[in-house]
Curated annotation (Swiss-Prot):
It comes from the Eukaryota. InterPro entries: Fungal_myosin-I_SH3 (IPR035535), Kinesin_motor_dom_sf (IPR036961), Myosin_head_motor_dom-like (IPR001609), Myosin_TH1 (IPR010926), MYSc_Myo1 (IPR036072), P-loop_NTPase (IPR027417), SH3-like_dom_sf (IPR036028), SH3_domain (IPR001452). This is Myosin-3. The lineage of its organism: Eukaryota, Fungi, Dikarya, Ascomycota, Saccharomycotina. Residues 988-1086, 1106-1136, 1203-1252 are annotated as: Disordered. Residues 1050-1063, 1106-1121, 1203-1219 have a biased composition (Polar residues). Keywords: Actin-binding, ATP-binding, Cytoplasm, Cytoskeleton, Hydrolase, Motor protein, Myosin, Nucleotide-binding, Phosphoprotein, Repeat, SH3 domain. Residues 719-739, 740-767 form the IQ domain. The modification Phosphoserine is found at S357. Its main location: cytoplasm.
Length: 1252
């Protein structure tokens, strides 16, 4: 048993000392789920767009949305809440590296924060993907993790963290909107920097805004919405705002109702409006500032309700002047100036350096509507920029905030039916991000291989620099430069500017990534070809508010409006003002420069479908994204040299269990260099050297299958350790069961109850063949009993009970045993298969054995109703074959080979007397319907000595005992003889281990047998009488003609001979006087005892010496004896209680260990334990010195015949009863020997690997 082994081993040497303080102890992750697909695309066996898509789809269908490509995270939008952003989930990623937890956005955040603290380098995460793929959600989760993970020790730090988190709902309200593809689409780009102090606590922040889609303010396509804030404000505005600003429901405003979508499923605008107000308060916006913000929003909504009619001259006029009156009230300007600005345009002419004339040109309805929308867009754009700047002021950096983590959340790549200036700007920025992604990824890989001195082959990839130059270049001019030239040529006329731009596009026709079509042009982006409309594109690029509107807003008495429009028109400046294209190019290049200064992380988001369904995975849609995101190229780059790499410490921490030299009982014990530990692990795991390379600080593994093999071996380590503990525990339980059975047998023997209760069944077995079949030697032994349930199926926690459960057997088992069944194969061949045969009161079960996943499974092959058995066919020779002939069964008749066939047949005939037993030289049975097969039998000297041989339909067997042979009589020996010495040896072992002096104690009132049973079930709960010093049990020497008295020996006799007579041990007590004959006990180990007992048993079996000792004169009835111990008795009236020192007469000694005694006055008589009394010679005698005489007396009473005086027997030779008794003793000894050897073999097998 494993527990004993560890105790023994600890005597020889202590366990290795734990080493490697940096290496964490390995632990079994019970929460680990079964891997779906691969968690890292670099581990795919085949690299293709289709295999990547299949892996992502498989994980998406199982609710797993995150996958790695090395350190790049792939995120598939689930369109539902998966419950994976809880506080417990966050805690599970804290302090763990990428391989220690499943892919997750929290793992990216943890890696950035760890690198910030460890290497003191700025970090950034680039989140890319198309609209609706989940970029904004990923950014929010990163901010959530960093705020929760970074420690907080002051109120100011906590306030900054709250303010950083509050920017999310605020900027989402003003910068996000519902589109056809996404309910919360970012219509602007932002780069949020969270800055940290020297203690790596967030102490400041800064937001950079990129290109707000202001066109959405004045118009949206059907089923899309304006920015969220308009619907939140119109639905959730308090009564105060409704009175001051005239706020109505969104259906009352053209800007919020024209697209016929004012509500979004699963979005509560009123609740989100309250969150927006809370975010404003958290950031520090005052009540006055909030009022001014909502006043401007109300002005925008009412501006949208200004409508025009055509007058008689064909010019525009205000349809309802009450609307313009209210707008003038909100903007705090004069109504007349507002109306003029909307329906007239001021035109100035110049003559050289002289001032020219000024004209007021009336506008038509289309032109007036454009001016109205331009005013609304300008107010909202400037309001949004003011909010961003106000947030940055609140997040003002404290001194020492020089390190940061940047989070880029920018609009994704867009392809619509009609694409204009906004789309080319958005797609240009994504091209720049794709360019920096490729450059930084390749650069990072190259730097890693160079630093680690690893050689690799560069991989080819598409460099989209040519597309970026096509859009942003100045010499030769790109698309934006051509657009600026067209505007400068025809500044006042938008149509003329569009035509001039179309002409300049002819310069790009030679570019392979450009195509010019009628009134349209195509740019072949990395994400796909996009067709842009030329009409109106130049006007959107101007980014200038008309002079009329600027002058109007400059007259306002509202300080907030003047604040958001600070710039005054420069009428005398001849320098061309920057266009929107110029601004976006400048912002994109600044962004690239900022990202290049930080250590980047990447999140690539994917949108699974266009219907926002949580169950649909559109393969073609995702395949397109996989291609334009370049995931296949990214995988190839990552795997160009090696599929997996890890620093030495983390590799050892993960796999040190695979090396016995590095681990002991789950602890890391290697005290050498970590590099040497890496080499040992790879060597002990049998990983070929061609599968890896070792760098300076990292181990590089070439193929994913190698990593899979390492992970599989690590997983099996825990399984093997659990299985080993289970085996040890089962052995321990089985030992207790065996001990209980031995004690029960001893109790039954002492009480006169026969251990063998199946004598009548055994005798019936002699008659079952009718004297026609030869018998085996083992079948005729007197010790042979029909025990029935040999597999202990009716017991609990046994293999038999496990088989019974597997076969779904619910009845009580009458017979169970292992055997074989002949299975007919195609072509006439046959195969012997191992089976288990179980007999119940109604059925015969044949259970097959099947091995699956290194575990044995038991499946029912046959369930035969006893009433369906017609006959049993056996041969007339001593073989073990029998055929069960069935009645009208579609299945073939079973042909069985079973050592206990006679017992099974006997039980079958008793349960169903109509079963006929056919004994013949052949066995006939049906192999199939109407397919009779005959098995012959014949003698053969080539057959095994104790078995038979089946060959080509013939049973070969040796000659057996005559058919009329009957079994020997049951041996008349007591079970206590067999097991008594074993229990005594156990007590001796315990006393040797303890080694402390104890005074003799009286036995408890319960009987000795009951005490022994208690000791078996509770080994530590019983204390037997012990002595201070013990003598080794003396050994009887081989019998000679002149008998020598037994002599005590200080050392156990190592002679290879042993007498057949039993030496009964008795409890020993401490003595007050030592004689010269007594010898001090030898401190012999338990192992020596077992070895000598085994040698003695082996010698006995070799010599087959069944001799009995010489007769010894019987003791007279008047012999006097003295009580050596107190014997209070168990309360049985047949016992005679004694106190130590009492003198008694002994008239009879029984082999069971009891003596019939009486007091000196013959007033009381009863049974006393023989081992508790010694021969009385008139002095106080040492009990130990008398025990040999008592044993001699018992031997004399046990054996009524001496081999030295055979003439005294009536029959020549030993009787059957005496021979059976001695043979039974030898068989019992052999059984104990085999059991001991089996246990030692099991222990020997686990000595090498018992490291748990």
């Amino acid at each position: 048993m494993a527990i004993i082994k560890r105790v023994v081993r600890s005597k020889a040497g202590q366990a290795p000392v734990k080493k490697g303080a940096k290496i964490k102890k390995a632990s079994y992750d019970s929460s680990r789920k079964k891997e779906v697909g691969v968690s890292d695309l670099t581990l795919l066996s085949k690299i293709s767009d289709e295999s990547i898509n299949d892996n992502l789809k498989k994980r998406f269908e199982h609710g797993i949305i995150y996958t790695y490509i090395g350190y790049v995270l792939i995120s598939v939008n689930p369109f539902r809440d998966l419950g994976i952003y809880t506080d417990d989930t966050m805690k599970s990623y804290q302090g763990k590296n990428r391989l220690e937890a499943p892919p997750h956005v929290f793992a990216i955040a943890e890696n950035m924060y760890y690198n910030l603290k460890s290497y003191n380098e700025n970090q950034c995460v680039i989140i890319s993907g198309e609209s609706g793929a989940g970029k904004t959600e990923a950014a929010k989760r990163i901010m959530q993790y960093i705020a929760a993970t970074s420690s907080t020790h002051s109120e100011s730090i906590s306030k900054i963290k709250d303010m950083v988190l509050a920017t999310n709902p605020l900027l989402e309200s003003f910068g996000c909107a519902k589109t056809l593809r996404n309910n919360n689409s970012s219509r602007h780009g932002k780069y949020l920097e969270i800055k940290f102090d020297a203690h790596f606590q967030p102490c400041a922040g800064h937001i950079t805004n990129y290109l707000l889609e202001k066109q959405r303010v004045v118009g949206q396509i059907k089923n899309e919405r304006n920015f969220h804030i308009f619907y939140q404000f119109t639905k959730g505005a308090p009564e105060e705002y409704r009175q001051l600003f005239g706020v109505q429901q969104p259906e009352q405003y053209i800007y919020t109702s024209a697209s016929q979508c004012t509500a979004v499923e699963n979005m509560d605008d009123v609740e989100e409006f309250n969150e927006t107000l809370n975010a404003m308060r958290t950031i520090g916006l005052t009540k006055s500032e909030q009022d001014q913000i909502f006043r401007a929003l109300a002005a925008i909504l009412w501006i949208g309700n200004i409508s025009f009619v055509e007058n008689e001259a064909g010019n525009a006029e205000i349809r309802d002047k009450s609307v313009t009156t209210f707008v003038a009230y909100l903007l705090e300007v004069q109504e007349e100036l507002l109306i003029k600005a909307l329906i007239e345009r001021i035109i100035e002419t110049t003559h050289g350096a002289k001032r020219g004339s000024t004209y007021h040109s009336p506008l038509n309805i289309i032109q007036a509507t454009a001016v109205r929308d331009a005013l609304a867009k300008a107010i909202y754009n400037n309001l949004f920029e003011w909010i961003v700047e106000r947030v940055n002021n609140s997040l003002q950096a404290f001194p020492g905030a020089d390190k940061s983590i940047g989070i880029l959340d920018i609009y994704g790549f867009e392809i619509f039916e009609h694409n204009s200036f906004e789309q080319i700007c958005i797609n240009y920025v994504n091209e720049k991000l794709q360019q920096i992604f490729i450059q930084l990824t390749l650069k990072s890989e190259q730097d890693t291989y160079k630093k680690e001195q690893i050689h690799w082959t560069p991989i080819e990839y598409f460099d989209n620099k040519i597309v970026c130059d096509l859009i942003e270049a100045k010499r030769p001019p790109g698309i934006f430069a051509a657009m600026n030239d067209a505007i400068a040529t025809a500044h006042a006329d938008s149509d003329a500017a569009d035509q001039a731009f179309a002409q300049r596009l002819n310069l790009f026709t030679t570019n392979p990534h450009f195509e010019l079509r009628q009134n349209k042009f195509v740019v072949k982006h990395y994400a796909g070809d996009v067709t842009y409309d030329i009409f109106g594109i130049t006007d959107k690029n101007k980014d200038q508010l008309q002079k009329d509107l600027v002058e109007l807003l400059s007259t306002t008495s509202n300080s907030f409006v003047r604040e958001i429009f600070p710039d005054q028109p420069q009428t005398d400046s001849r320098r061309r003002p920057p266009t929107s294209g110029d601004k976006i190019i400048k912002s994109a290049n600044e962004l690239v420069e900022t990202l290049s200064k930080a250590q980047p992380s990447y999140i690539r988001t994917i949108k699974p479908n266009d219907t926002k369904s949580s169950t649909i995975y559109d393969d073609q849609r995702v395949l397109h994204q996989i291609k334009y995101l370049g995931l296949k190229e990214n995988v190839r780059i990552r795997r160009a040299g090696f599929a997996h790499r890890q620093v030495f410490e983390k590799f050892v921490e993960r796999f040190y269990l695979l090396s016995p030299q590095c681990s002991y009982a789950g602890d890391y014990v290697w005290d050498g260099e970590t590099l040497d530990a890496v080499k040992l692990i790879l060597q002990d795991a049998s990983i070929p050297t061609t599968e890896y390379e070792i760098g300076v600080t990292q181990i590089f593994i070439k193929h994913p299958e190698t990593l899979f093999a390492l992970e599989n071996m690590r997983d099996k380590y825990w399984y093997n350790m659990a299985a080993r503990i289970q085996r040890a525990w089962r052995r321990y339980l089985q030992k207790r069961i065996d001990a209980a059975i031995r004690i029960q047998n001893a109790i039954r023997g002492k009480s006169g109850v026969s251990t063998f209760r199946n004598d009548e069944l055994r005798n019936a077995g002699d008659k079952v063949y009718g004297g026609k079949k030869e018998r085996r030697n083992m079948s005729l032994l007197g010790l042979r009993g029909f025990y029935g349930d040999y597999l202990s199926c009716n017991e609990s926690k046994t293999r038999g009970s496990y088989i019974k459960r597997q076969a779904n057997i619910t009845e009580r088992v009458l017979f169970s045993s292992h055997g074989n069944s002949l299975h007919a194969m195609y072509g006439g061949a046959s195969q012997r298969l191992r089976k288990t045969f179980i007999l119940t009161p109604t059925s015969l079960w044949i259970v097959g054995h099947t091995k699956a996943r290194n575990a044995m499974k038991y499946i029912t092959d046959y369930r035969i109703d006893l009433g369906k058995i017609r006959s049993i066919s056996v041969t007339n020779l001593q073989d073990d074959w029998m055929a069960v002939n069935l009645m009208d069964s579609p299945k073939p008749d079973p042909l069985i080979n079973l050592p206990f066939k006679t017992e099974l047949i006997t039980r079958l005939t008793q349960l169903n007397p109509r079963i006929h037993v056919k004994v013949s030289s052949t066995i006939e049975y049906l192999r199939g319907p109407k397919k009779l097969f005959v098995v012959k039998s014949q003698y053969s000297d080539s057959a095994p000595k104790y078995h038979d041989l089946y060959r080509n339909g013939t049973i070969l067997v040796r000659h057996g005992n005559p058919p009329d042979s009957t079994a020997e009589n049951r041996p008349a020996f007591n079970n206590e003889d067999m097991y008594g010495n074993l229990m005594e040896a156990k007590h001796k072992t315990m006393k040797k281990k303890v080694g402390t002096k104890r005074t003799p104690q009286a036995l408890p009132t319960s009987s000795l047998a009951a005490s022994a049973a208690q000791a078996a079930y509770h080994p530590k709960g019983i204390r037997s009488p012990t002595s201070t010093e013990q003598k080794s049990p003396s050994k009887s020497k081989p019998i000679t003609k002149t008998r020598k008295p037994p002599v005590s020996s200080p050392v156990r006799n190592t002679s290879k001979t042993i007498s057949n007579s039993k030496v009964y041990s008795a409890p020993k007590a401490s003595v007050t006087k030592r004689t010269q004959d007594t010898v001090s006990v030898s401190k012999t180990s338990v192992k020596d005892d077992v070895t000598q007992e085994k040698n003695a048993i082996i010698q006995t079996e070799e010599k087959q010496n069944y001799s009995l000792p010489e007769n010894i004169p019987q003791s007279s009835q008047t012999d006097s004896y003295q009580a050596a111990y107190d014997f209070p008795g168990s309360g049985n009236p047949s016992e005679l209680p004694l106190q130590k020192g009492d003198i008694i007469y002994v008239s009879k000694s029984d082999p069971s260990g009891w003596s019939l005694a009486s007091t000196l006055d013959n007033s009381k008589e009863g049974w006393v334990p023989t081992s508790y009394i010694v021969k009385y010679n008139g002095n106080v005698t040492d009990p130990s010195a008398q025990h040999q005489d008592m044993n001699t007396m018992k031997i004399q009473e046990d054996n009524t015949t001496s081999i030295n005086e055979p003439e005294t027997h009536t029959n020549q030779g030993p009787s059957n009863t005496d021979l059976g008794a001695n043979l039974a003793s030898v068989l019992a000894a052999r059984a104990n020997k085999l059991r001991s050897e089996s246990e030692e073999d099991i222990s020997r097998e686990e000595d090498d690997d018992d490291d748990w």
